[in-house]
């Protein structure tokens, strides 16, 4: 129950052309009803209850439920920085960070079972360099730890040469698919997640993928996938879509262009307001710092600020608390879901809110 053979072949071909740039074996792909199912079953197969998955913070909040509800695996938020300025050039994860996490987990009497990286990252939009991925890979293999890279935003990339944002990028880091490292290493400890929901804007169709060269893992995945399968009709429709190579090439290019234009609208306003943010290279988000507006350095104050912004300005951000980071007052802004005009209106409202707060008039 890994998915229809024709669909998996079409998915492998699509990913080879647009994401991985290396050959994928369709027999090593598992297809499930969305990214949540893929994450949940991967965790269930690879981990025992009480094992620990290490995830650099800030991270996607629902990882906690996705990895824990079925398998009982715990999430460890690995703090690698405090200020946003420390990750303006990209994620700051180092081997020293991994060693520190391993020491703390062992001290607690638990097992460091899995390292999860999202690339491009949610919520920061940062991209792990080839060298960072390689160092993490070698460390995980040396320590017998599973490394999973989630490339769900791998085709949602920002054009860093855009005139409004190009000054933010001093290093020419480009997206490098983890599949290439997997191909070179041929290790049972390396796995790749992908889903079509974000890059293709089809969240409701619920189609996620796992790619692994671990034959025992793939067999187990097929055994437990029965209740998580994607409907034949959905697989057929998406197979036809992926097979239209001219359309898909045009779509991917246009999507990145429009994503960049919307991102530039956000950054133009943040620069004018001098609000700290992390320069994104991909994903659908901007990670920004509104801590100056907190009445006190607490989670409660962050929640109050989040609610005040929504009630008084009609702008809904994602508060930072669930992302597992140490600093209060950080928020995630999701920008691709509306037109540039409406996005501009939202940013004007955010600007007005910030200015009123600074002047003490609200």
Language-model features and meaning:
Residues 1-142, 154-184, 348:
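Conserved core of the PLP fold type I
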Residues 13, 185-186, 298-299, 308-317, ...:
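PLP-dependent enzyme catalytic core of the Aspartate aminotransferase-like
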Residues 142-143, 273, 313, 357:
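Helix C-cap/helix->beta junction micro-motif
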Residues 189-282:
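PLP-dependent aminotransferase class I/II
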Residues 256-260, 264, 273-312, 337:
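Conserved PLP-binding catalytic core of the aspartate aminotransferase-like
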């Amino acid at each position: 129950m890994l998915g229809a053979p024709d669909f998996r072949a079409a998915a492998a071909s699509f990913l080879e052309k647009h994401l991985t740039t290396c050959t994928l074996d369709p027999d090593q792909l598992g297809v499930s009803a969305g990214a949540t199912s893929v994450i949940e079953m991967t965790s269930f197969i690879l981990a025992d209850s009480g094992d620990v998955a290490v995830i650099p913070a800030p991270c996607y909040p629902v990882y906690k439920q996705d990895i824990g509800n079925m398998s009982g695996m715990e999430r460890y938020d690995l703090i690698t920085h405090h200020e946003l300025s420390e990750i303006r050039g990209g994620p700051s994860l180092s081997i020293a960070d991994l060693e520190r996490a391993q020491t703390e987990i062992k001290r607690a009497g638990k097992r460091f079972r899995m390292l999860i990286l999202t690339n491009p990252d949610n919520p920061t939009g940062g991209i792990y360099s080839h060298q960072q991925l390689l160092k993490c890979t070698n460390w995980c293999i040396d320590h017998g730890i599973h490394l999973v890279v989630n490339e769900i935003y791998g085709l949602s990339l920002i054009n860093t040469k855009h005139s409004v944002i190009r000054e933010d990028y001093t290093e020419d880091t480009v997206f490098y698919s983890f599949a290439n490292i997997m191909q070179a290493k041929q290790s049972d400890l390396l796995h790749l997640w992908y889903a079509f929901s974000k890059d293709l804007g089809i969240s409701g169709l619920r189609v996620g993928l796992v790619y692994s060269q671990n034959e025992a893992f793939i067999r187990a995945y097929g055994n437990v996938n029965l209740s998580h399968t994607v409907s034949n009709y959905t697989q057929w429709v998406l197979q036809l879509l992926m097979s239209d190579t001219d359309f898909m090439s045009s779509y991917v290019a246009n999507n990145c262009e429009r994503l960049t234009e919307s991102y530039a609208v956000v950054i133009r306003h943040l620069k004018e307001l001098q609000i700290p943010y992390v320069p994104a290279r991909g994903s659908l988000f901007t990670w920004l710092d509104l801590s100056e507006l907190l009445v006190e350095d607490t989670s409660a104050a962050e929640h109050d600020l989040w609610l005040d912004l929504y009630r008084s300005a009609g702008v809904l951000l994602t508060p930072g608390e669930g992302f597992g980071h140490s600093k209060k007052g950080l928020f995630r802004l999701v920008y691709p879901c509306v037109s540039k005009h409406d996005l501009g209106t939202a940013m004007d409202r955010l600007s007005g809110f910030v200015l009123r707060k600074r002047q003490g008039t609200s």
